[in-house]
């Protein structure tokens, strides 16, 4: 699974067969240090393993030590155009830089950033997307094709390689899922650098999760990808939940509850939608490696979910609690959730 090369950002290893890490990005203004710190803590608590922050100007560099003091996960500085901001971020203790070397000027500036990162063991992510492609590459391909995205990423990597810098992570994001998938497939064929997967500008929570699941999931199933970010026009905490859900759905991540529930049918006699949502919410932060099922009827429920460690199946104003397909007891509908949670505690 993943790349051959491994880089280290703070306490997280990326690539080289290590676990797939989950990332997100602060969306609080970088001048709001208190708000940024509060959101970073929320992301860490939700399971975010790498947090990125925009560093648009010199004042924003002050955010880095505040974040480093507040959370234990690595902090990534997102920098565009001004190489001096990258140097200042390095000096401030940043764990990783996101930058496109071709956008920061002459070779001496690229060398300065490469040297500063090498001296401190700071990896650099080259983040290419449809809007960042060079004029020459666009002229060659006509529009942001997968080949264009891959060529651009490898071009930027070559600028760092020229100065003996190889602690590189690549991303080639597109808002078109098929383009994104093909771009990463090409990169996986042409280099051994760790790959940061994501569908950029994926959209609101509903469509963004669908597009990210399709794109990120397809690549991970084929062993491509080392770290992921689900980009949503929503609370970043929801990005983290969605990313972990993708990893659980693919059986890549084993920590936490795998939750299954039936779509309901005419046999359902309980408010299964309400019950399922309540159970899922209450087990969101449970770290037990178990499968929990919420089924609509007692006719098929226990049998269909016999692989679940624990579950409930609805009846007429009541329901059954079952374990590995075997019925444990019958309880009233209003007690089903509590009964299920009690059994989860025993596991």
Report each predicted region and the residues it spans.
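N-terminal amphipathic alpha-helix/helix-capping segment at the start of soluble metabolic enzymes
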Residues: 1-25, 118, 281
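Active-site mouth loops of central-metabolism enzymes
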Residues: 17-35, 54, 73-81, 137-150, ...
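Hydrophobic faces of well-ordered beta-strands that scaffold small-molecule active sites
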Residues: 20-26, 51-53, 75-79, 97-99, ...
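Glycine-rich, proline-tolerant flexible connector loops at the mouths of alpha/beta enzymes
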Residues: 33, 44-67, 98-106, 168-177
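Alpha-helix-loop-beta-strand connector modules within alpha/beta enzyme cores
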Residues: 58-79, 112-124, 184-195, 279-281
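Glycine-enriched alpha-helix->loop->beta-strand junction motifs that scaffold or abut catalytic
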Residues: 70-73, 91-97, 118-120, 188-194, ...
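Hydrophobic or amphipathic alpha-helical targeting/insertion segments
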Residues: 84-125
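Catalytic alpha/beta core domains of metabolic enzymes, predominantly
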Residues: 129, 137-284
């Amino acid at each position: 699974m993943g790349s051959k090369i491994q880089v280290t950002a703070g306490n997280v290893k990326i690539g080289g067969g290590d676990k797939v890490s989950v990332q997100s990005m602060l969306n609080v203004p970088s001048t709001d240090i208190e708000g940024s710190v509060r959101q970073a803590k929320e992301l860490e608590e939700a399971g975010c393993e790498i947090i990125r922050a925009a560093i648009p100007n010199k004042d924003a560099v002050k955010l880095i030590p505040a974040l480093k003091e507040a959370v234990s996960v690595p902090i990534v500085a997102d920098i565009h155009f001004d190489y001096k901001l990258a140097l200042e971020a390095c000096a401030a203790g940043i764990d990783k830089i996101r930058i496109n070397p071709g956008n920061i000027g002459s070779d001496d500036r690229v060398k300065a950033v490469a040297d500063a990162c090498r001296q401190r063991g700071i990896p650099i992510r080259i983040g290419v997307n449809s809007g960042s492609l060079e004029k020459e590459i666009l002229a060659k391909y006509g529009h942001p094709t997968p080949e264009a995205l891959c060529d651009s990423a490898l071009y930027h990597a070559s600028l760092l390689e020229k100065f003996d810098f190889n602690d590189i992570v690549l991303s080639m994001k597109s808002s078109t899922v098929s383009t994104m998938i093909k771009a990463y497939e090409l990169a996986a064929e042409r280099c051994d650098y760790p790959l940061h997967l994501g569908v950029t500008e994926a959209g609101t929570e509903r469509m963004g999760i669908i597009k990210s699941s399709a794109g990120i999931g397809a690549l991970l199933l084929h062993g491509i990808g080392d770290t992921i970010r689900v980009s949503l026009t929503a609370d970043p905490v929801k990005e983290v939940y969605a990313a972990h859900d993708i990893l659980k759905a693919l059986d890549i991540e084993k920590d936490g509850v795998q939750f299954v529930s039936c779509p309901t049918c005419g046999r359902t006699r309980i408010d299964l939608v309400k019950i399922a949502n309540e159970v899922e919410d209450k087990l969101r932060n449970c770290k037990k490696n178990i499968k929990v099922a919420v089924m609509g009827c007692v006719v098929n429920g226990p049998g269909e979910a016999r692989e679940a460690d624990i579950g409930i199946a609805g009846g007429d104003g009541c329901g059954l609690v079952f374990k590995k397909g075997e019925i444990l007891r019958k309880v009233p509908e209003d007690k089903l959730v509590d009964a299920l949670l009690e059994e989860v505690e025993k596991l």
